[in-house]
């Protein structure tokens, strides 16, 4: 896989929350850290995402969002 993004974190999908159009995919990247990303339901299907599957969280500096609770 060749991509321009330099921040690539390998992990395992721990849960997928399906909505009507999008899904929130939670990836355990180790060290007690879970990264969450909103993707389309079409992407979930195309990538065959399912709990337990290895996946990469790919982060481009121009696409980072920050939130607080």
Curated annotation (Swiss-Prot):
Record-annotated Mop domain positions: 2-68
InterPro entries registered for this protein in UniProt: Mo/tungstate-bd_C_term_dom, Mop_domain, Transp-assoc_OB_typ1
Protein keywords: Molybdenum
Disulfide bonds: none
Pfam families: TOBE
Gene3D superfamilies: 2.40.50.100
GO biological process: molybdate ion transport
Family membership: To C.pasteurianum MOP proteins.
Function: Binds one mole of molybdenum per mole of protein and contains a pterin.
Name the record gives this protein: Probable molybdenum-pterin-binding protein
Upper lineage: Bacteria, Pseudomonadati, Pseudomonadota, Gammaproteobacteria, Pasteurellales
């Amino acid at each position: 896989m060749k991509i321009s993004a330099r921040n690539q974190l390998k992990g395992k999908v721990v849960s997928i929350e399906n909505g009507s159009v999008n899904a929130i995919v939670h990836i355990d990247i180790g060290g007690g850290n879970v990264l969450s990303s909103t993707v389309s339901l079409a992407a979930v299907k195309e990538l065959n995402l399912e709990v337990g599957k290895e996946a990469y969280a790919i982060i481009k500096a121009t696409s980072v969002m920050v939130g607080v609770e």
